[in-house]
């Protein structure tokens, strides 16, 4: 067990059902350690991967770490007419964590758009929702993104802070996805607070 896992109040995630939504951002590679940390903390993790995210990280990687098949679309078996029920997924979860949350996904969520399974689950979820934005600093500072994040907060969603640091573009500033260890720690703390 990692030092982080042994120092984290794992009991707060033990038995928790976490939907981890991964959207298209270079930070999608951080979904792998994030998934591992959530599982180590005792959570049952179901990963939802957007088509854009699959260009950065594979379903095989996240499925291996979560010990569950990764869901990438509405259809499970098109020939048989089997589909992934977004309503059931939204009701199953104790928390919906979207990390990374790209500018595109943030805009879709803020405006009630449903182009993919992740967005449909978001609109169906009755559980607390947590978003970890990840994009370049000018995108993060753009008024459209700022307004969309404010709107998501007004819906009761928690938006993690985006720390300053070196970005994939080589620029330095805010827009980075919060590190997986910090996300798991804050998620656990907020879920406990929600129950009190």
Features from the language model and the residues they span:
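A cross-family phosphate/adenosyl-ligand binding-site feature
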Residues: 1-130, 137-196
């Amino acid at each position: 067990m990692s030092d982080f896992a042994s120092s984290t109040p794992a009991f707060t995630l033990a038995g928790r059902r976490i939907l981890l939504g991964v959207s298209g951002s270079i930070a999608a590679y951080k979904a792998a350690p994030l998934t591992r940390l959530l599982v180590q903390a005792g959570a049952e993790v179901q990963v939802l991967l957007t088509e854009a995210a699959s260009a950065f990280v594979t379903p095989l990687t996240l499925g291996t770490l979560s010990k569950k098949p990764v869901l990438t679309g509405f259809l499970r078996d098109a020939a048989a007419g089997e589909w992934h029920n977004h309503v059931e997924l939204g009701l199953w979860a104790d928390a919906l964590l979207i990390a990374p949350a790209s500018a595109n996904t943030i805009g879709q969520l803020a405006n009630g758009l449903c182009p993919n399974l992740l967005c449909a689950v978001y609109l169906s979820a009755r559980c607390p929702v947590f978003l970890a934005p990840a994009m370049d600093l000018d995108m993060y500072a753009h008024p459209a993104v700022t307004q969309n994040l404010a709107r998501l907060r007004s819906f009761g969603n928690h938006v993690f802070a985006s720390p300053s640091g070196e970005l994939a573009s080589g620029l330095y500033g805010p827009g980075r996805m919060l590190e997986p260890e910090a996300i798991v720690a804050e998620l656990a703390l907020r879920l406990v607070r929600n129950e009190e």
